[in-house]
Amino acid sequence: MFDIGFSELILLMVLGLVVLGPKRLPIAIRTVMDWVKTIRGLAANVQNELKQELKLQELQDSIKKAESLNLQALSPELSKTVEELKAQADKMKAELEDKAAQAGTTVEDQIKEIKNAAENAEKPQNAISVEEAAETLSEAEKTPTDLTALETHEKVELNTHLSSYYPPDDIEIAPASKSQSSKTKS
């Protein structure tokens, strides 16, 4: 394809190893191979569509020639085949138009989906910030007695969670506080 010999390929690999390093070289090779596969797939798709279009054009040309030769002068068998060719040409034309329409709508649909996803991603963030604002407002409205009651409730809940998580032996063996550790060092 590119007329690259083995020695040139080895030279490219060594240069890639020096430039990219051993960690990034395999990733770069995979990326390039994915690009090549995608390009080959697109080229094959275009080639198939061109072949179908050429077949359609040939069928239309043969139909026009047959019409110009006056269909009434032809034998009944030949007129049947001409009608079949017309039907096939119309069918192929409809299929190609459908594929073209589907390709156009899928791209437009994908663009709409991406825009909707971006808008939906922004909405939950706004909703969270509104909830946080409401929470801070409700905390600011609380009286000091409410806060102390809330703190004791939170302490009880925290102790129950900690006691269920840690076995009783771990609770008794607690690290020394700063005042105890300074007394032992003195």
UniProtKB/Swiss-Prot annotation:
Recorded topology in the membrane: Single-pass membrane protein
MF-aspect GO terms: protein transmembrane transporter activity
Keywords: Cell inner membrane, Cell membrane, Membrane, Protein transport, Translocation, Transmembrane, Transmembrane helix, Transport
Entries under InterPro entries matching the protein: TatB
Similarity comment: family membership: Belongs to the TatB family.
Polar residues compositional bias, start-end: 177-186
Coiled coil: none
Main location (coarse class): membrane
GO CC annotation terms, alphabetical: TAT protein transport complex
Organism, as annotated: Haemophilus influenzae (strain 86-028NP)
Start and end residues of each stretch annotated as Disordered: 162-186
Function as written in the Swiss-Prot or TrEMBL entry: Part of the twin-arginine translocation (Tat) system that transports large folded proteins containing a characteristic twin-arginine motif in their signal peptide across membranes. Together with TatC, TatB is part of a receptor directly interacting with Tat signal peptides. TatB may form an oligomeric binding site that transiently accommodates folded Tat precursor proteins before their translocation.
Organism lineage: Bacteria, Pseudomonadati, Pseudomonadota, Gammaproteobacteria, Pasteurellales
GO annotation terms (biological process): protein transport by the Tat complex
Name by which UniProt lists this protein: Sec-independent protein translocase protein TatB
Transmembrane segments: 1-21
Cellular location(s): Cell inner membrane
Complex and partners: The Tat system comprises two distinct complexes: a TatABC complex, containing multiple copies of TatA, TatB and TatC subunits, and a separate TatA complex, containing only TatA subunits. Substrates initially bind to the TatABC complex, which probably triggers association of the separate TatA complex to form the active translocon.
